[in-house]
């Protein structure tokens, strides 16, 4: 058994359903401390829903920038991940206990096998191998781990980022270990994500008997033209990195349950997934103006889940793409599709954020799994990425002014 597989199995065996870390961070901190990492717990949230957060950084001597004495030449690379997992679903539908890591048919089965405990294990072992070969690197190494990514994402990475920003800790590069591959580890890298903006709309009517519509006001009938217009709106055309912004209804509630009562109100939940061609403020303004134009009596509450972010080609993508090519022979596709991740918080303090992990076909599913070969390939890609960033740092140090 490889060290990566062994650590992955240790993590999967801990039933860390959000926000319970189930001891994962203690295990990882014990692994990082001998490598010279200073481990800080930044736990947050109410006692009954306490979120576990770990910030671990390996100090490195600061070297003045040869071209700008006011800056340092040492860059910081952060691995960001989450130890929490989603609930298992019906246990009887699993082929094996989801928290008893099981190997069969060349795969590792268990909740978190793909999302994302194998990514964490792969990066830890990649660090160990990298530091064994390069005990005094010219890059600073750090990890940001939380047990609140699959849940509200209020007391996890967001809190750590705020604390790092407040004390002036800088991050230059970040790899988020989310499962990004389509078929084989390395075939896709996420170099950005769309923003997410949710709204809850309450449309007020007047309840009444369905046989006397003249004595009532049906909020569903009133809202339908506005909803049709929202659904038909072209918000933007996207760009070379992002598809067009989309607006979707997720829930619609109205009525008393009786078939002879006109409802007094209608409640609608909707969501925008928006590109860098749009902004949250502009989308909010458009929706509110449209509702006013349709003469609705309404209340509208907004929740901004995250702004879009994009990492254009630079040092990190170059290091990652070279690592993937050397390890797998693949030319990674760059994509911004899919849901959101904690990268949306880290992008506030880090200019280069990418996501790289194993295939995502089984995430959140019954019998979640990952190929054993993908686990080792991911570890090697992470290690090669660190080696490439180290080579870049050495080259920059010797470059003439």
UniProtKB/Swiss-Prot annotation:
A GO BP entry: lysine biosynthetic process via diaminopimelate
UniProt entry tagged with the keyword Hydrolase: yes
Enzyme class of the recorded protein, top EC level: hydrolase
Entry binding sites for Zn(2+) 2: 115, 150, 364
Annotated residues for binding of Zn(2+) 1: 82, 115, 178
GO MF: acetylornithine deacetylase activity; cobalt ion binding; succinyl-diaminopimelate desuccinylase activity; zinc ion binding
Pfam families: M20_dimer, Peptidase_M20
Cofactor binding description: Binds 2 Zn(2+) or Co(2+) ions per subunit.
Cofactor list: Zn(2+); Co(2+)
Keyword Amino-acid biosynthesis annotated: yes
Known EC number: 3.5.1.18
Catalytic activity, as annotated: N-succinyl-(2S,6S)-2,6-diaminopimelate + H2O = (2S,6S)-2,6-diaminopimelate + succinate
InterPro entries, sorted: Bact_exopeptidase_dim_dom, DapE_proteobac, Peptidase_M20, Peptidase_M20_dimer, Peptidase_M20A
Pathway: Amino-acid biosynthesis; L-lysine biosynthesis via DAP pathway; LL-2,6-diaminopimelate from (S)-tetrahydrodipicolinate (succinylase route): step 3/3
Active-site residue list: 84, 149
Gene3D superfamilies in UniProt: 3.30.70.360, Zn peptidases
Keywords: Amino-acid biosynthesis, Cobalt, Diaminopimelate biosynthesis, Hydrolase, Lysine biosynthesis, Metal-binding, Zinc
SUPFAM superfamilies registered for this protein in UniProt: Bacterial exopeptidase dimerisation domain (SSF55031), Zn-dependent exopeptidases (SSF53187)
Family from the record: Belongs to the peptidase M20A family. DapE subfamily.
Subunit structure: Homodimer.
Main function: Catalyzes the hydrolysis of N-succinyl-L,L-diaminopimelic acid (SDAP), forming succinate and LL-2,6-diaminopimelate (DAP), an intermediate involved in the bacterial biosynthesis of lysine and meso-diaminopimelic acid, an essential component of bacterial cell walls.
Protein name: Succinyl-diaminopimelate desuccinylase
Organism expressing this protein natively: Verminephrobacter eiseniae (strain EF01-2)
Name of the gene encoding the protein in the UniProt record: dapE
